[in-house]
Amino acid sequence: MMLLYYALSFILLPVYFIIILIRLLIGKEDIRRIQERFAIGKHRQDDSLDFMQTSANKEEFKGDTSLRTTTYTLIREDEGLGSTYKLPLEASDARRLIWINAASIGESMVALTLIHNISKRYPDVRFLVTSWTNSSAKILTAKLPKIAVHQFLPIDNIIFTRKFLRNWQPDLGIFIESELWPCTINEGAKQCKLLLVNARISDKSFKAWLQRKSFFQLILKNCSKIIVQSERDLQKFNELGVSDAVNLGNIKFANEKLPVNQEELSKLSLHLDNKRVVLFASTHPEDEEVILPIIKNLKEQFLDCYIILIPRHPERVKSIIDNCKSHNLSATAKSQNDLPVLSDDLYIVDRFGEMGLFFSVATISFIGGSFKQGGHNILEAAYFSNCIIFGPDMSKNTDIAKGVLQNEAAIQIKNGEDLLTKLTYLLRSNNALELTTYRENALKFIKDNQKVLDEYLNVITKFL
């Protein structure tokens, strides 16, 4: 089965090139880094990567005079369709490299949490983080510490995957959530032990994998450890024939609170002048179809209410503003005006990395992607003690959604009419106590579940 997949990946190589070209044309690829999709670029011995310090032309390792430069000869290992290369043991011991693969934004936040906490226990470990999307790349590039570097994940083809692994020679691989690239995982397991952490399978993917159960098992047998995020996910893995997975809970509970620039927060809070902010976070077009029609009604009822919208993909800002005009709404983007125009109907935040700032001033936050995309991360808003609302589709975050609802830490709505009804109810002054209770319960829910991090670290560090 795997050989068939490899053969298809060769045959479909021209299609991969076309897909990358299309993604480039529609702005989903970074032309400055397009070569990384083909494993061309940086590598473990790159002179420009001071964080590894294993290159033969370095005079010494910074901060540690006991580790002097030595010239190493790569060891060639012939396997199957090609060769892999490894550093001799004494070289790889100098700086162990953990490779973390994070598909998109949510997984990238988990990667940052792992890096921060693993490096506390093992300060000499260095990190390579791969991801697929432009949005995750921007966040990781901005937030990664000096002990880590980001690269785009190459196309899942044996040529590019083996080249990537030769370039980086990781000592441990950690895949987050549901990134199951067959070639990458199969070849990666030849280089180092692989862990699948915070693993989950959406209901849609589960149905698809049931038709390909043997292939699913073939991929997952390459993982030395599989840690799932819920009992439901554990059941799914078991039904797919993976019997050695364990459930430690959702590591997103351990993600650090989103950063906030305090100077910007003071300026924004002063500017908003005690207005009650309703934030629509990580929205998609399907969310905006529901949200935009109710804004006028909301603003007319509550003069002290201000609407802020943060699209999941900021590059959509022009189309959102056009949609606002079609609904007779006035809107300004942050790229146009650094502070909200209070006379407008809404303010659109089209910059990455500022979600924490706007959660800080929000009273109520609607979590986007919850009408058709399976929902985004509820917990980020909970850290800021927001009253949380989400739509009917939380299929990608089923257990967290169930947990917050059971603890009266969030509200689920069915449609646009229901959303308007709930917002109207919460914003009425005589319901202020109930609004405060939801906000307090959201923060308590986070704090009650944070012990999960230590359990994950205890498992992961056994492989270091």
From Swiss-Prot:
Catalyzed reactions per annotation: lipid IVA (E. coli) + CMP-3-deoxy-beta-D-manno-octulosonate = alpha-Kdo-(2->6)-lipid IVA (E. coli) + CMP + H(+)
The EC number of this protein is: 2.4.99.12
The record's GO CC annotations read: plasma membrane
The UniProt transmembrane annotation reads: 2-22
Q: Tell me the superkingdom of the source.
A: Bacteria
Gene Ontology terms, MF aspect? Kdo transferase activity
Q: What does this protein do?
A: Involved in lipopolysaccharide (LPS) biosynthesis. Catalyzes the transfer of 3-deoxy-D-manno-octulosonate (Kdo) residue(s) from CMP-Kdo to lipid IV(A), the tetraacyldisaccharide-1,4'-bisphosphate precursor of lipid A.
Q: What is this protein called?
A: 3-deoxy-D-manno-octulosonic acid transferase
Native source organism of the sequence? Rickettsia conorii (strain ATCC VR-613 / Malish 7)
What gene does the UniProt entry assign to this protein?
waaA
